């Protein structure tokens, strides 16, 4: 039987299956952070159970850490208690922890790949919905709830229903200044936020094959915003080059054996997908969200759609409420909208490739006086590399705050957040009401679009900046 990549990964990890029951899958890698793990560890200890395979469990502090300093007290008492609990639990069960003072601390979905902990062919889980990021390596990676975190800690397995397979081919030619963030926002606009329910999405096509691993991670990171369980991309030479010589990858002969196996991780020719979509992005422009879900997005030179354009009454009502919350009106151009804050960071867009692109845009320019702009590297390694290249000096000279690593303003769980009705150009992945702070208004954009917005104090087509750089 010809199989999709998802089916291959799923079937190869079944350890027990009984008729009319969800199969039990073996989990190769369990990633843990401070927010969704305390209850799981507490329940585990109350039942006198242990972590079954601590060497396949890695932990970090990211969600509620302060990125202003490395003080465990900076984000409040609850955050401090959660971080202290993680230290205690990792010490007790001998789990590798990248804590606040570890040079490799960072966002869980950044440090896994950059350390070579994430590998093709794995099943990977974490108590975080954007675990789908790791699917860029040809891994079956998905978020789980706290009770499931406990189950994986105790058994290294998890009950999982079989899902359907969706195939999205992305083809065409892209203009300078168009990024993976623009691509995935456009895909979400075309397919909607619920099209992926019950599916794992495999991305392919000539565009995907040309993307770096950082960009592929952005695609898979936001597959969850279509309602999918995960996104996945078959590993190839780009994947292998990225992983080569990273700390936790196989070494010596084992590396060659791993490559041989990883090359088999692709959908069979003729494998049947439950849904397939071909998306041409040849004329794609930079994307900016205007509403309160990622599908409410337009090209920078377009205007916000009129409510009459929605045939579905539910979508029309959703758009109406989104505009009310965002303080916008149908027919408006986002180029006319001023912003107060810029956030460049998150597990979607905080890697070294993102920061290099931002530096090119802001070099020898100044952040608008009315804008508070922060750049938050995704990990200690990203921060060190950026500083080695002098990017931090470019950012600071331009008026950006250069921070320590963490999730920061992606979510209102730490000391970085929006105030009521503050408008933010953000490189994160969700623009829900209150996501970045109560009453805060989030516009999702690429790193270079966010950088340009910081300079001008409003949204602009970043391609005009690229064109001026070429002259």
Curated annotation (Swiss-Prot):
* One record GO biological process: L-leucine biosynthetic process
Q: Which PROSITE patterns match?
A: ACONITASE_1, ACONITASE_2
Cofactor detail note:
Binds 1 [4Fe-4S] cluster per subunit.
Q: Which InterPro entries match?
A: 3-IsopropMal_deHydase_lsu (IPR004430), Acnase/IPM_dHydase_lsu_aba_1/3 (IPR015931), Acoase/IPM_deHydtase_lsu_aba (IPR001030), Aconitase_4Fe-4S_BS (IPR018136), Aconitase_4Fe-4S_dom (IPR036008), IPM_dehydratase_rel_enz (IPR050067), IPMI_cat (IPR033941)
Cofactors, names only:
[4Fe-4S] cluster
* Pathway participation: Amino-acid biosynthesis; L-leucine biosynthesis; L-leucine from 3-methyl-2-oxobutanoate: step 2/4
Q: What is its EC number?
A: 4.2.1.33
This chain's function reads: Catalyzes the isomerization between 2-isopropylmalate and 3-isopropylmalate, via the formation of 2-isopropylmaleate.
Question: How the protein assembles, per its UniProt entry?
Answer: Heterodimer of LeuC and LeuD.
What the entry lists under NCBIfam families is as follows: leuC, PRK05478.1, PRK12466.1
Q: Which family does the similarity line name?
A: Belongs to the aconitase/IPM isomerase family. LeuC type 1 subfamily.
> What name has this protein been given in UniProt?
3-isopropylmalate dehydratase large subunit
The organism that produces this protein has a lineage beginning with: Bacteria, Pseudomonadati, Pseudomonadota, Gammaproteobacteria, Enterobacterales
């Amino acid at each position: 039987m010809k199989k999709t990549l998802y089916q291959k990964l799923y079937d190869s990890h079944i350890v027990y299956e009984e008729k009319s029951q969800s199969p039990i899958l073996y989990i190769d890698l369990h990633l843990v952070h401070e927010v969704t793990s305390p209850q799981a560890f507490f329940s585990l200890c109350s039942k006198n159970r242990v972590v079954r395979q601590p060497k396949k469990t890695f932990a970090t502090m990211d969600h509620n850490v302060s990125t202003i300093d490395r003080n465990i007290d900076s984000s409040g008492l609850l955050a401090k208690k959660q971080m202290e609990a993680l230290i205690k639990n990792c010490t007790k069960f001998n789990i590798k922890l990248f804590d606040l003072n570890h040079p490799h601390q960072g966002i869980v979905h950044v440090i896994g790949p950059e350390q070579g902990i994430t590998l093709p062919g794995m099943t990977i889980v974490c108590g975080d919905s954007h675990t789908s990021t790791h699917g860029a390596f040809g891994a079956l990676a998905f978020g789980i709830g706290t009770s499931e975190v406990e189950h994986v800690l105790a058994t290294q397995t998890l009950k999982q229903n079989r899902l359907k397979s969706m195939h999205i081919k992305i083809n065409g030619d892209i203009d300078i200044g168009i990024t993976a963030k623009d691509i995935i926002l456009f895909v979400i606009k075309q397919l909607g936020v619920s099209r992926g329910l019950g599916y794992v999405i495999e991305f392919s096509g000539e565009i995907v094959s040309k993307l770096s691993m950082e960009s592929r991670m952005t695609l898979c990171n936001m597959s969850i915003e279509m309602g999918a369980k995960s996104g996945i991309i078959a590993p190839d030479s780009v994947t292998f080059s990225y992983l080569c010589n990273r700390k936790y990858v196989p070494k010596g002969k084992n590396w060659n054996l791993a490559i041989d196996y990883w090359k088999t991780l692709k959908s069979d020719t003729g494998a049947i997908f439950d849904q397939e979509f071909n998306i041409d992005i040849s004329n794609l422009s930079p994307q900016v969200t205007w509403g309160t879900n990622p599908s409410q997005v337009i090209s920078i030179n377009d205007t916000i759609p009129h409510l009459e354009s929605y045939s579905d009454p539910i979508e029309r009502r959703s758009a109406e409420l989104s505009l009310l919350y965002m303080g916008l009106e149908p027919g408006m151009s986002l180029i006319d909208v001023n912003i107060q804050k810029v956030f460049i960071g998150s597990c979607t867009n905080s890697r070294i490739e993102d920061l290099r692109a931002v530096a090119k845009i802001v070099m020898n320019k100044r952040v608008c006086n009315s804008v508070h702009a922060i750049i938050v590297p995704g990990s200690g390694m990203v921060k060190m590399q950026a500083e080695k290249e002098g990017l931090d000096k470019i950012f600071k000279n331009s008026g950006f705050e250069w921070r320590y690593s963490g999730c920061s303003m992606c979510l209102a769980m730490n000391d970085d957040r929006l105030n009521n009705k503050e408008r933010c150009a953000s490189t994160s992945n969700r623009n829900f009401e209150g996501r970045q702070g109560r009453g805060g208004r989030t516009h999702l954009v690429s790193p270079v679009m966010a950088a340009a917005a910081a300079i001008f104090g409003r949204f602009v087509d970043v391609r005009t900046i690229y064109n001026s750089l070429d002259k």
